[in-house]
């Protein structure tokens, strides 16, 4: 109705300049889509099957399908009663041609010797000559209308069902197979237990086959062809049989094959997967021959640091009046960093490191502290709406009630949490605090460029910066928070009713946590939440909300309030060999703060808790690792979350991206790791492409022999502990040579990055189930896993020879480098 009104009485729009300002424009009506919807609704197709670009082609294609469906109904299912309405409509054009005169007819009835007679009028059709042309014209005018009406009333099944049957014939052995095996149920709407709308039938295919009937073998051959097309030709090994089995179960789930039939079809289909056409086995033997994989010994390669080629200034109007960024260039005295790589590893991914220079430091501060990029332009980070964090106060209240009132640690108690270099640093800070109390100057930031492995596949990313405060400040704040971190994590778990904060667990424990979370749901789906530069988006309001947790544990503590307020108004300096940078920033999480990890946990959990309460969804499970989150829900809630989550977080000042959902446990990615089943249960395994490319690079200076030995030992011990019983990656870490540890050696964590989760140890073997689960997680088939392991067996490290050049031969991992 609104469309008709707009066509009859169009609104007059006022245009100012090139664009209309302050004028509400109505969306244009797509006549093509409107006609398609009207026609398809009348034709009862059940869905809009619009695959063409022109209206003429669309109508022609629709009529062809409609005619074929009606002809099939007439040839196979015709009944007299189905066509009564159509025949009645077809006789309407004949009615104007006839003239109906009446004649008297006497009817006599006799009963008990008496006779009763009466006259009745009987119509007598005839074709009179008078007015014949006029009657003929009326009949001809009605003929096309009645023909269309008669065609429209001809019986047929739904076009969506007919199309499904037609497609099925292309994949079955013959038409009888498609007709007998495929039964499409009519659509019916149901209500779920939670009141949600469910649609059953309509597009659902069921395979109906009785025991002993010959339809199972052709169907088994067909799904075997589909499985080989998806996975490829694999050798007949236990792990590859499991891989084929998983693919075919997914196909039969989609086809709704009865479980009694799967018991017979599955062994037949798995056997068909290993029946190869002529020439396939010979080609596979040539592909996997040892002569085609000539691997050289792995020597140490030194790669120089890089300087960003991008130089961007902060646009005017972005900085607040109290914010400043001053750059002072000095003499060109910048020194190059180095990154060391072990050559010969079967991965083409390469990593570099940013130099500690003025150009890198400036870009890191501009793009990772002050500005975000939106539509190719630098702008200020989004700010939360007024009162947005106030709506999250029920979560904070629930957590603080579980924690209760805390007591501040003494200096010795705080120092007991540290060892090594950090212990020495904080010990000197404590000695200084005994002489001079903490002051606002201790909260000032010292900024430098992070020595991080940067993938060459990312182009020229903005360098990351580290912004620690004075150790004196960290000691005073740590006395309030360091011992309460685990208690706050447990309190958050208590509010959610399950393990939510994934911190302090082994890789095996985290894998089992995900297994338990997944089993809670009937039809689970996992959604990854990617917070773009979470630390940078922490506004003053977000930090104040976080500080409310700490203030509630220490009510009325003035020193704590003063320490926390200094985090809201940041002052920092960055010293590099070729210049200095001085800046002031309101809000923003500083990466060197002692409460960075704890604060990110609390903020993310609070926002997810408030969001799910906002939607009214009670069945969900959250795995949180700071700014990296995975949300597991029932599939019926997926669309609701995908459509509303980014806007909700934007109102809180965060740019949140909803990653594509996954429907298998192994496909869940959490902190660049996937759950993988192995002999001991479930384990979180780092992405194989990331692990085998990053862990052959080292950003520390390992030029001296003792440090090289310590680094190799750390890679071997740490990697094997994390990957015992896992295909490929266990073999990879075992190739790092073990050396005798000298009496005075560097600690492991000083020469290599600390692993995300500790290893639980244990001596496990690689099982077929582990290979199948590894394939589901990373897409490497059993044959590809064995080929990689064979290549790693022939990879020999030489960390003490002369520095070589980067040499690489193609491998399976190069197809999708992370």
UniProtKB/Swiss-Prot annotation:
EC number from the UniProt entry: 2.7.7.48
GO biological process per UniProt: viral RNA genome replication
Stretches assigned to the RdRp catalytic domain: 524-641
Superkingdom field: Viruses
Enzyme's top EC category: transferase
Reaction catalyzed: RNA(n) + a ribonucleoside 5'-triphosphate = RNA(n+1) + diphosphate
Keywords recorded for this protein, A-Z: Nucleotide-binding, Nucleotidyltransferase, RNA suppression of termination, RNA-directed RNA polymerase, Transferase, Viral RNA replication
SUPFAM superfamilies the record matches: DNA/RNA polymerases
Keyword Iron-sulfur listed: no
UniProt entry tagged with the keyword Transferase: yes
Gene Ontology MF annotations: nucleotide binding; RNA binding; RNA-directed RNA polymerase activity
InterPro entries registered for this protein in UniProt: DNA/RNA_pol_sf (IPR043502), Rev_trsase/Diguanyl_cyclase (IPR043128), RNA-dir_pol_PSvirus (IPR007094), RNA_pol_HCV (IPR002166), Tombusvirus_p33 (IPR013707)
Family: Belongs to the tombusviridae RNA polymerase family.
Physiological role: RNA-dependent RNA polymerase that plays an essential role in the virus replication.
Note: Readthrough of the terminator UAG occurs at position 297.
The name this protein goes by in its record: RNA-directed RNA polymerase
């Amino acid at each position: 109705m609104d469309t008709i009104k707009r066509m009859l009485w169009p609104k007059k729009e006022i245009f100012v300049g090139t664009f209309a300002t302050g004028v509400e424009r109505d969306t244009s009506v797509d006549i093509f889509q409107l006609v398609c919807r009207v026609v398809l609704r009348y034709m009862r197709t059940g869905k809009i099957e619009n695959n063409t670009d022109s209206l003429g082609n669309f109508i022609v294609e629709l009529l062809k399908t409609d005619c074929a469906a009606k002809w099939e109904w007439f040839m196979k299912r015709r009944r007299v009663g189905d066509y009564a309405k159509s025949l009645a409509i077809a006789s309407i054009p004949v009615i104007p041609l006839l003239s109906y005169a009446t004649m008297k007819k006497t009817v006599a009835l006799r009963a008990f010797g008496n006779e009763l007679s009466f006259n009745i009028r009987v119509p007598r059709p005839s074709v009179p000559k008078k007015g014949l042309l006029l009657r003929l014209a009326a009949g001809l005018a009605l003929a096309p209308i009645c023909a269309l009406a008669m065609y429209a009333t001809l019986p047929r099944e739904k076009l969506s069902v007919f199309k499904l049957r037609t497609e099925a014939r292309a994949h079955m052995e013959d038409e009888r197979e498609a007709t007998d095996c495929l039964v499409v149920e009519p659509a019916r709407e149901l209500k779920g237990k939670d009141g949600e709308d469910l649609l059953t039938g309509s597009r659902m295919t069921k395979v109906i086959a009785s025991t002993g009937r010959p339809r199972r073998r052709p169907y088994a051959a067909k799904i075997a062809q589909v499985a080989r097309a998806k996975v490829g030709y694999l050798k007949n090994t236990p792990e590859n049989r499991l891989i084929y089995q998983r693919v075919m179960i997914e196909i039969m789930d989609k086809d709704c094959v009865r479980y009694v039939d799967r018991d017979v079809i599955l062994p037949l289909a798995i056997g068909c997967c290993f029946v190869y056409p002529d020439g396939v086995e010979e080609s596979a033997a040539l592909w996997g021959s040892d002569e085609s994989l000539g691997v050289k010994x792995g020597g140490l390669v030194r790669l120089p640091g890089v300087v960003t080629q991008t130089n961007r200034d902060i646009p005017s109007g972005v900085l607040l009046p109290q914010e400043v960024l001053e750059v002072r260039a000095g003499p060109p005295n910048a020194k190059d960093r180095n990154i060391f790589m072990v050559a010969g590893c079967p991965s083409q991914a390469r990593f570099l490191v940013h130099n500690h220079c003025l150009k890198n430091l400036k870009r890191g501060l501009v793009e990772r502290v002050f500005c975000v990029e939106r539509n190719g332009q630098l702008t200020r980070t989004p700010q939360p709406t007024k009162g947005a964090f106030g709506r999250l106060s029920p979560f904070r209240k629930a957590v603080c009630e579980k924690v209760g009132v805390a007591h501040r640690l003494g200096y010795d108690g705080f120092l007991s949490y540290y060892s090594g270099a950090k212990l020495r640093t904080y010990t000197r800070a404590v000695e200084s605090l005994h002489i001079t109390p903490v002051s606002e100057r201790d909260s000032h930031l010292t900024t430098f460029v992070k020595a991080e492995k940067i993938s060459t596949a990312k182009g020229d990313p903005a360098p990351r910066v580290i912004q620690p405060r004075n150790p004196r400040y960290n000691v005073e704040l740590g006395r309030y928070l360091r011992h309460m971190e685990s208690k706050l994590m447990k309190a958050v778990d208590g509010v959610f009713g399950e393990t939510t904060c994934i911190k302090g667990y082994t890789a095996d424990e985290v894998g089992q946590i995900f297994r338990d979370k997944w089993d809670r749901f009937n039809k689970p789906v996992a959604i990854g939440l990617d917070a773009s530069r979470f630390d940078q988006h922490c506004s003053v309001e977000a930090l104040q909300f976080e500080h409310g947790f700490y203030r509630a544990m220490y009510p009325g503590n003035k020193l704590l309030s003063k320490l926390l307020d200094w985090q809201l108004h940041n002052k920092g300096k960055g010293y590099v060999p070729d210049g200095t940078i001085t800046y002031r920033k309101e809000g923003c999480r500083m990466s060197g703060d002692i409460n960075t990890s704890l604060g990110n946990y609390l903020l993310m959990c609070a926002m997810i808790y408030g969001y799910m309460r906002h939607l009214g969804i009670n069945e969900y499970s959250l795995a949180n690792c700071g700014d990296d989150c995975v949300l597991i829900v029932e599939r019926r809630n997926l669309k609701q979350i995908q459509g509303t989550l980014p806007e909700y977080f934007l109102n809180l000042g965060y740019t949140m991206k909803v990653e594509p959902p996954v429907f298998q446990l192994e496909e869940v990615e959490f902190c660049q790791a996937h759950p993988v089943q192995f002999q001991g249960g479930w384990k979180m395994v780092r992405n194989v492409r990331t692990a085998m490319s990053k862990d052959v690079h080292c950003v520390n200076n390992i030029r001296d022999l003792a440090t090289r030995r310590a680094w190799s030992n750390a890679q071997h011990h740490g990697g094997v502990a994390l990957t015992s019983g896992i295909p490929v990656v266990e073999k990879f870490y075992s190739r790092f040579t073990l050396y005798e540890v000298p009496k005075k050696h560097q600690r492991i964590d000083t020469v290599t990055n600390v692993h995300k989760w500790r290893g639980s140890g244990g001596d496990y073997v690689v099982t077929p189930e582990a290979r199948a689960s590894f394939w589901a997680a990373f897409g490497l088939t059993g044959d590809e896993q064995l080929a990689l392991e064979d290549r790693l067996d022939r990879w020999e490290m030489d960390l003490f020879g002369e520095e070589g050049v980067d040499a690489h031969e193609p491998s399976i991992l190069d197809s999708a480098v992370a």
